[in-house]
Regions:
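N-terminal catalytic cores of NTP/NDP-binding nucleotidyl/phosphoryl-transfer enzymes
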Residues: 9-72
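Glycine-rich, Lys/Arg-enriched anion-binding loops that position phosphate/diphosphate groups
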Residues: 141-240
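Phosphate/ribose-recognition catalytic cores of enzymes acting on nucleotide-derived substrates
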Residues: 195-307
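N-terminal Rossmann-like or analogous alpha/beta NTP/dinucleotide-binding catalytic cores
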Residues: 59-144
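Residue-level signal for inorganic ion chemistry
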Residues: 27, 80, 118, 178, ...
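Residues at the starts of beta-strands that form the adenosine-phosphate
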Residues: 45-49, 86-87, 147
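N-terminal, positively charged, Ser/Thr/Ala/Gly-biased leader segments
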Residues: 3-9
Length: 307
């Protein structure tokens, strides 16, 4: 997949279809858009692509309001490539871009010589203040070479799928529901860093400590059944996120004990899939009581992971 920083970098002598959206999480609803992009591109003999944005526009419009994200930019690009997109325009929104009127944005799209199709979700908005709606795309391009298709919101068990709904699930620890909306367990990619070594030296459970960006959505503190993707292989695991109150830590950590794994992975890239919440964070009177609880947690995690 070719990643481009602006609309002006798109090919001028080759036709393309663009799906437009922020696409945080690339969830099942977004995947409907990607599928429609590919269908329309095939009809038009064009390349399938997307127009997306990073970081979230709210980071520019209201820096004090924190919008936690489901994906890093690298994870988003990897997901778009996996969905079969050949092109990805990733605009970094600034005050100038966000001040554009809906009419100006439409005019910029219309001046793209290779554009032959646009696909968006029904709740898509654009232009200053979000005044432009998906229906405006249809009306603007209805007598042009550009075919516009609007994709209805997808539902799961009667609930509309959206990035906001998925964030709410994760923040509530409802990892199974988040997975139903995403189409897979929620994942976080980061680097393995050195921790306090209590898991190895005190408790007898060596853990991998995951460093993640501050703008990621994290589940509430507690213990989770997880899967760890390390060096191209996936392993069942158990993860604790929290402040380790038994030891009086102030800093939040994400520590993962990988079952039947004894390799050194410090500094390696690591992807963690959050499968199910086992329990909330607890403070124990002694390390021995914590170890006893960890054994119970591991068994529950293995049962949940079917290992």
């Amino acid at each position: 997949m070719t990643i481009l920083p602006t609309l002006h970098d798109l090919p001028k002598d080759q036709p393309f279809v663009l799906g437009i959206g922020f696409f945080d999480g690339c969830h099942l609803g977004h995947q409907e858009v990607f599928s429609e992009v590919k269908r329309l591109a095939k009809e038009k003999g064009a390349q399938p692509g997307v127009l997306t944005f990073y970081p979230h526009p709210m980071k520019v419009l209201a820096p004090d309001i924190h919008v936690p994200l489901l994906q890093s930019i690298d994870e988003k690009m990897d997901a778009l490539a996996a969905q079969g997109m050949a092109l990805a325009v990733c605009i970094r929104p600034d005050e100038t871009f966000l001040a554009k009127s809906a009419e100006d944005f439409l005019g910029e799209l219309a001046r793209l010589p290779g554009l032959v199709g646009l696909v968006t979700g029904e709740n898509f908005s654009f232009g200053h203040g979000g005044l432009g709606k998906s229906g405006d795309l249809v009306r603007f391009f209805e007598e042009s070479r550009v075919t516009v298709r609007i994709v209805s919101l997808r539902e799961n068990a009667g609930k509309k799928i959206s990035s906001t709904a998925i964030r709410q699930c994760i923040l509530a620890g409802e990892m199974e529901q988040a997975a139903r909306f995403l189409g897979h367990p929620y994942t976080i990619r980061g680097d393995i860093v050195h921790g306090f070594r209590r898991g190895h030296d005190v408790l007898g459970f060596p853990t991998a400590n995951l460093a993640v960006s501050e703008d990621r959505v994290l589940p509430p503190d507690g213990v989770y059944a997880t899967r760890a993707l390390v060096k191209g292989h996936t392993f069942p695991a158990i993860t604790n996120i929290g402040n380790n109150p038994t030891f009086g830590n102030a800093k939040k950590t994400i520590e993962t004990f990988i079952f039947d794994f004894d390799e050194s992975i410090y500094g390696a890239s690591f992807t963690l899939a959050w499968v199910a919440r086992i329990r909330g964070e607890m403070k124990f009177a002694s390390p021995d009581l914590l170890v006893a609880q960890i054994h119970q947690d591991i068994q529950k995690a293995k049962n949940r992971l079917h290992v």
